[in-house]
Amino acid sequence: MDNQLDVPLGILKLPVPLKEDYNRRQKLIELIEKPLWTITGKCAKNTLIPDLVSICKVNDQHQFIIFDAKYYNAHLEKGIVPTGQPGIESITKQYLYQLAYQQFIEDHNFSSVKNCFLLPTENNEIEDKGEVRMEMLSNLGLQDIKIRLIPATMAYDLYLSGSKMDMERLDL
């Protein structure tokens, strides 16, 4: 998936040159704010950590893509109440990842932002299972979360061969 969380900002292939306000050696993961505990005047050690962030060019458009891999056996079929799907905490956290990177995304003129849950499937093809949306967060300009089921055998093969998936296959 070409995870770029631990890549220094100065190396990333951005739509425009890195803005001067950013440290070229700082990593993408380090842009996420840590909680400040006001009584101590100190920040906590931990913060939000997305599974994967990819910066790629698809159809001449620079995309900032935030992935969260889930190991659920979700049943998502038209007209049927969903079961086995990621919970509210996973959904809100995925929206927060975008919010955490929003300034960086705006500063560097990305064409689009994509949020996506990746779930396994025993089938042989990538499956588009729509999106999950929370209107109050969509109304803030955050992107709804796309759902893609990835064949488990494909994921294993890519991992074992050290290969990266072509993002266009996900049709985000």
Predicted features and spans:
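Catalytic core segments in nucleotide and nucleic-acid processing enzymes
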Residues: 1-172
